[in-house]
Regions:
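Generic anion/oxyanion-binding catalytic loop in active/binding sites
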Residues: 66, 78, 90, 97, ...
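N-terminal Rossmann-like NAD(P)+-binding domain of SDR-like oxidoreductases, especially those catalyzing
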Residues: 1-193
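Glycosyltransferase donor-binding loop in the core domain
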Residues: 72, 81, 96, 108, ...
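C-terminal substrate-binding subdomain of Rossmann-fold SDR/epimerase-dehydratase oxidoreductases
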Residues: 212-342
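Short-chain dehydrogenase/reductase
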Residues: 109, 157-165, 199, 203-211, ...
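Short, flexible, glycine-rich and Lys/Arg-enriched loop motifs at helix boundaries
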Residues: 34-38, 188-209, 219-240
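A structural signal for well-ordered alpha-helical scaffolds and beta->alpha junctions
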Residues: 48-52, 164, 206-210, 245, ...
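Alpha-helical structural signal
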Residues: 13, 17, 98, 116, ...
C-alpha cells in the first residue's frame, strides 16, 4: 500500500515525503516539476544544480517513486493508484502566488480547482478513500479578528484563496456523496527547512519573505522589497504566523492517521498562534545572519491582508499537534543553514 503525493518535489511536499518515508510509508510522487528550478523559465544554474541535488536525495529514499505528469491527467492518476495500490492522497500541487492570481485568475482556477477536481475524481474511481489537502489561510481573506478560528467567515481577497476554498467545498461534497474522508490543512506561512540543511525553500520566482530576506543579507539576492508600510499594524507592515515546514510535515502524518481510522477532519488551521510583522522578521533575520538585510519600500501587493494569525487550538485538540521547530529564531537558523548549504 502506498501514498500518492502530488507536488512531492515542492517545498512542503518534499519535506512530507521525507517524513513519510521515515515513518515507514511508501510514496508515489506525481509532479510536473513546473515549480522547480529545472521547470522554471529563468532560474540560475546554481539554483538548478542545488535543486537537482535535493530532488535526487528525495528519490534516493527507500520506497519513493517519481512520476512526472499533470494532476489533471485522469488516466495517468488512476493508473498510478491502481498499479501502486494507493490508499490515500496528499495533495500539495498547485499555484501559490497571490499576486500572480490577481493578474492571471484563470490559471489558479484551472490548476487549483479544475485540475484538482479531475484528480479527485480519478483517485476516487481508483478506490482511494482518504485525501489530505494542502489548503491555505488565504481562504479567510481579511479577518474580522485575530487569531483566526476555523469557524471564521471565509471571504478570500485573492483568486488564489478563492480557488483553494472552492476545492475545500469539492471535498466536503465528495464526503457527502461518496464517503471520502478528508482534511483541508489551512497553512499560515510555511517557512524554515530541514535542520540537516539538505532541503531548502525554492520557488521560481521566489516570493516568500524569509528566503528573500536571507538571500539579500547573504548577498545572494537583490535588496528586499517591503510591500506596504501603511497597514493597520503596530509598525505598518503585514503580520504573519510562521510555521516550520517540518512541523507541517508532521501535522500531515497526524491528519492521515485520523483519516485512516475513519475520522474525517474537514478544515484545520496549522499555525503557531503568534504573529510577526515584516519588520520584526527582517530584524530577526539580520540578527541570525549577523548583518543587516538590505531593503526598500514598495507599494502594497494586491490581495495581501494586514494580519493572518492562527487560532491553532483545533489542531492541538483533534490531532495532538504542537509545533516543535516553529520558534522564529530556530526557523530562521534552519532556513539559513539550507541556503548556505545550497
Amino acid at each position: 500500500m502506498s501514498l500518492l503525493v502530488t507536488g512531492g518535489v515542492g517545498f512542503v511536499g518534499s519535506h512530507f515525503v521525507r517524513a513519510a518515508v521515515e515513518a515507514g510509508r511508501r510514496v508515489i510522487i506525481l509532479d510536473d516539476l513546473s515549480g522547480s528550478a529545472a521547470g522554471g523559465a529563468a532560474a540560475a544554474q546554481s539554483d538548478c544544480q542545488a535543486e537537482g541535488a535535493a530532488i535526487a536525495r528525495i528519490l534516493a529514499l527507500p520506497g519513493v517513486t517519481l512520476q512526472v505528469g499533470d494532476i489533471g491527467d485522469s488516466a495517468l492518476v488512476e493508473s498510478l493508484c491502481r498499479t501502486h495500490h494507493v490508499t490515500a492522497m496528499l495533495h500539495f500541487a498547485g499555484k501559490i502566488q497571490v499576486g500572480e492570481s490577481v493578474r492571471r485568475p484563470e490559471l489558479h482556477f484551472d490548476v487549483n480547482f479544475a485540475r484538482a477536481l479531475s484528480l479527485l475524481e480519478a483517485v476516487r474511481h481508483a478506490g482511494v478513500g482518504q485525501v489530505v489537502f494542502s489548503s491555505t489561510a488565504a481562504v479567510y481573506g481579511t479577518p474580522d479578528q485575530v487569531p483566526i478560528a476555523e469557524s471564521a467567515r471565509c471571504e478570500p481577497d485573492s483568486p488564489y484563496g478563492r480557488s483553494k476554498r472552492a476545492f475545500e467545498w469539492a471535498l466536503m461534497s465528495a464526503e457527502v456523496a461518496h464517503g471520502i474522508k478528508w482534511a483541508a490543512l489551512r497553512y499560515f506561512n510555511a517557512a524554515g527547512a530541514h535542520p540537516d540543511g539538505t532541503m531548502r525553500e525554492a520557488h521560481h520566482p521566489e516570493t516568500h519573505l524569509i528566503p528573500l530576506a536571507l538571500d539579500a543579507a547573504l548577498g545572494k539576492g537583490p535588496p528586499l522589497s517591503i510591500f506596504g508600510s501603511d497597514y493597520p499594524t503596530a509598525d505598518g507592515t503585514c503580520v504573519r504566523d510562521y510555521i516550520h515546514v517540518c512541523d507541517l510535515a508532521a501535522a500531515h502524518l497526524l491528519a492521515l492517521r485520523e483519516l485512516e481510522h475513519g475520522r474525517s477532519l474537514g478544515p484545520l488551521n496549522l499555525g503557531t498562534g503568534t504573529g510577526y510583522s515584516v519588520r520584526q522578521v527582517l530584524d530577526a533575520a539580520a540578527d541570525v545572519v549577523g548583518r543587516p538585510v538590505p531593503q526598500g519600500l514598495a507599494p502594497r501587493r494586491a490581495g495581501d491582508p494586514a494580519q493572518l494569525v492562527a487560532d491553532a487550538s483545533a489542531a492541538r485538540q483533534r490531532l495532538g499537534f504542537a509545533p516543535v521547530r516553529s520558534d522564529l529564531r530556530v526557523l530562521l537558523e534552519d532556513a539559513l543553514r539550507s541556503r548556505r548549504h545550497g
